[in-house]
Amino acid sequence: PVLMIATYGENDKVDVMNMAWGGICDNNMVALNISEGHKTAKNIKERGAFTLSIADIDHLEESDFFGTASGNNMEDKFERTGMHAIKSTRVDAPIIEEYPLTLECRVSELQHESYGFRVLGEIVNVISDEKILDESGKVDPTKLNAFVFDQFQNGYYKISYTIKNFYSINLKIFL
């Protein structure tokens, strides 16, 4: 899904970036592959923390704006969207209230590679809106109203239903 990185800049100014490359890379870790020129990269280096939210269709316009406007050139980028942020009590980063699922993350490693800049973050907490949970209290992906970005067509596509459960598809091959 499309992921939104939220950080604090100078004077606790909220900055949000739409991330194209990255995601969960271990049970309690995320990987962000971003350009070091982004304001978000600078903020992550200075603060050592960020939040990572799943964007939903209800906030597609704002999420797309966060991916096209630069915090380096637009000081009121976050404010223009009308969205709201609260300070995390666990990490030095903002939580965007409108997004239904947010991972609070602490930087564990910064990697400078030939292909770019990678941030590895430890997930220290997960915040989810009750409306996206199933009867057992687990996140129901169909209730997230999430979308993905297709780099071939530059389009956003809704994630809508389960096609098959993991580990149930190829059981015949194992037998």
List where the protein language model places each region.
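Basic, polyanion-binding surface patches
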Residues: 1-175
